[in-house]
Design a protein with these regions (language model features):
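Active-site phosphate-binding strand-loop segment of PLP-dependent enzymes
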Residues: 90-183
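Conserved PLP-binding active-site segment in aminotransferase class I/II-type PLP enzymes
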Residues: 1-56, 253-256, 357-362
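PLP-dependent aminotransferase class I/II
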Residues: 32-36, 41, 66, 110-111, ...
Length: 362
């Protein structure tokens, strides 16, 4: 049994009729003048920061617990960065933001909705006050793409996120806003990366159906795709293959299966005292994975890989972020996201639980 890594693509999925427009749950509550689709989250971020400012240099506050790709995209757009602290519950440290605001003018604040969650009432009220005072809110829902709440998600001036982390598509990200954006041409999404990743996804599907095929072949192509992604920083639109999938897939099945798998893992790992889910799932929250904290993260990650459970570390943060916030540093050293997505059922979740139990000898 193999769990995680890149999403395989079934050839049959490519024959499904296009029968819907692209929409996410948070969009039910609000209307947006502009929704644009990009090849990657970093393209959506860089595009946003390049075109939302009216002066030469802007200053943004980023959370200390953040992906280096976010930091790099903001820097490429020419913005200055300061980091605000987070709490151990992965919430905004309001006091830290106030301290930074007191040191000089800030144009924007970058808000991340972590691991399927949404904002607490106090942080939401604080952010809305800043928004009223003219601070631009850029809200990243890459971890909470399908999460829904009438207030606490989707409130940013610019709402963006990666789509490809959730679905069997080679690329994809979005930007939604009511703000005016210039009509700037975007490069085609047909790139070496999208082609190679698409091929790797098809090859993985074939490998899973016929284990006589060499796994190394699709892994090599997948690695070539990743290398291509990180050598081409062109802002691109989404590829035609991914755009087509977004108009034909069943979003409700994705949401339902992820919630069922996550809740099943939470309920059946309570006896494992060495791991802790990052937070309890609340109504409307849809997890990107079973995200846990463990003091033995690196050893656990290695053990899971040896047993064909391929996990993500969100994130190994930069030295600047570590220096800015010891809480973020501690979380970065202990966090791990175990796959529980729509590809899997209770059978695969039981296997994950068994592997976790073997690691701790229970």
């Amino acid at each position: 049994m193999e769990i995680g890594s890149i999403f395989e693509i079934s050839v049959e999925d490519l024959f499904v009729d296009e029968n819907q427009t692209f929409k996410l749950p948070f969009m039910d509550e609000l209307k947006y003048n502009t929704v644009r689709l990009f090849n990657s989250g970093r393209s959506a971020i860089e595009y946003t920061f390049r075109h939302m400012k009216s002066k030469e240099v802007g200053k943004v506050l980023l959370p200390s617990f953040t992906c280096t790709s976010i930091v790099d995209a903001v820097k490429r757009a020419g913005w200055q960065i300061d980091y605000y602290r987070i709490t151990k519950e992965l919430r905004i440290d309001i006091g830290s933001v106030k301290d930074l605001l007191g040191k000089g003018f800030v144009d924007a604040i970058y808000v991340i909705q972590y691991f399927g969650g949404y904002q607490e009432p106090d942080t939401y009220a604080f952010l809305k006050e800043l928004q009223f005072d003219g601070v631009v809110l850029v809200e990243d829902i890459s971890h909470a793409l399908y999460t829904k709440h009438p207030q606490y998600i989707g409130f940013g001036d610019f709402v963006l996120g990666s789509i490809r982390k959730w679905l069997p598509i080679p690329d994809g990200a979005f930007l939604a806003t009511d703000c005016m954006l210039p009509s700037v041409p975007i490069e085609s999404g047909c790139s070496d990366y999208s082609f190679l990743y698409f091929v790797a996804q098809i090859m993985k599907s074939a490998y899973l159906q016929d284990k006589r095929l060499k796994k190394e072949r699709f892994l090599d192509v997948g690695q070539a795709a990743t290398s291509s992604l990180f050598s081409d920083y062109t802002i691109r639109e989404i590829s035609p293959i991914s755009r087509r999938y977004l108009t034909s897939y069943n979003m409700h099945e994705v949401v339902e299966r992820r919630i069922k798998n996550y809740d099943y893992l939470v309920d059946n790992t309570k006896h494992l005292l060495h791991i802790k889910p990052v937070f309890a799932r609340l109504p409307g929250q849809v997890p990107i994975g079973f995200t846990i904290l463990s003091n033995e993260r690196d050893s656990l990650l290695e053990f899971l890989v040896r047993n064909d459970v391929y996990c993500n570390v969100h994130w190994r943060i930069s030295d600047a972020c570590i220096s800015a916030d010891p809480v973020a540093a501690q979380i970065s050293e202990s966090i791990l996201t175990i796959p529980c997505d729509q590809r899997y059922s209770e059978k695969e979740m039981d296997y994950v639980i068994q592997v976790l139990e073997r690691f701790w000898g229970t």
